[in-house]
């Protein structure tokens, strides 16, 4: 999947345009714009998480980004790389790696809230109230796997990680901590999505 800033911008612009068109065409009867606005907000929240996450982790292990994310050709041969340039690239990577996760989570929440026999739809305020919890779940899981990575508990995932530890290459404790944080972000996001869908279903059933 191409995570270029252009694609992110186009995706958000399309959703925003659809929302505006819905309001223009239907006026007060417009309803779909709320869905598009909700998706845009979910994408924005995910990107904020990704940017903050990578601003922190690029300071824990510049090696993870320089070597692991293959930024050497962009940042140049200076070791360690210029902190400012690294920070800029971390913003790009963080936003690009998370926007689609926000879109997916927002979409599954809307699907879970679609009209059905299980109960009345929840107002969008109830859906929005789940976003901080989703954010918190993701952070907790990311931090947990970050600690696991630091303690080499994730080295079994790849022989390359075992080699890093054995050769003491690229400050391996820090490198693996950042790997764990990033892995935990995706695992946490998936768990948070499951929580969101199940809680929406449960709340809809209880309202019957």
What are these regions (language model features)?
Residues 6, 80-103, 169-192:
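Hydrophobic alpha-helical transmembrane segments
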Residues 7, 19-22, 47-60:
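Alpha-helical transmembrane segments of multi-pass membrane proteins
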Residues 9-22, 136-147:
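Hydrophobic core of alpha-helical transmembrane segments in multi-pass integral membrane proteins
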Residues 9-20, 99-109, 183-198:
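Hydrophobic cores of alpha-helical transmembrane segments in multi-pass inner/ER membrane proteins
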Residues 24-34, 106-134, 198-208:
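Cytoplasmic juxtamembrane regions at transmembrane-helix boundaries
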Residues 41-55, 129-152:
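Hydrophobic alpha-helical membrane-insertion segments
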Residues 64-68, 143-166:
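Juxtamembrane non-transmembrane "cap" segments at the membrane-aqueous interface
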Residues 64-86:
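Perimembrane loop-to-helix junctions flanking transmembrane segments
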């Amino acid at each position: 999947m191409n995570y270029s800033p252009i694609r992110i911008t186009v995706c958000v612009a399309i959703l925003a345009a659809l929302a505006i068109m819905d309001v223009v065409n239907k006026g007060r009867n417009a309803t779909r714009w709320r869905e598009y606005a909700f998706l845009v907000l979910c994408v924005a929240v995910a990107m904020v998480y990704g940017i903050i996450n990578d601003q922190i982790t690029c300071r824990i292990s510049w090696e993870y980004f320089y070597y692991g994310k293959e930024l050497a050709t962009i940042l140049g041969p200076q070791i360690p790389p210029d902190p400012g340039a690294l920070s800029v690239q971390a913003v790009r990577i963080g936003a690009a790696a998370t926007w689609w996760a926000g879109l997916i989570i927002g979409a599954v929440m809307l699907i879970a809230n679609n009209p059905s026999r299980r109960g009345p739809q929840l107002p969008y305020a109830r859906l929005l109230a789940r976003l901080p919890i989703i954010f918190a779940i993701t952070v907790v899981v990311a931090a947990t796997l970050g600690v696991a990575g630091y303690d080499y508990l994730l080295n079994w995932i790849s022989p390359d990680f075992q080699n890093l530890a054995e050769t003491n290459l690229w400050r391996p404790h820090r490198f693996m901590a950042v790997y764990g944080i990033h892995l935990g972000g995706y695992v946490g996001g998936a768990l948070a999505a499951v929580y969101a869908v199940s809680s929406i279903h449960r709340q809809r059933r209880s309202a019957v």
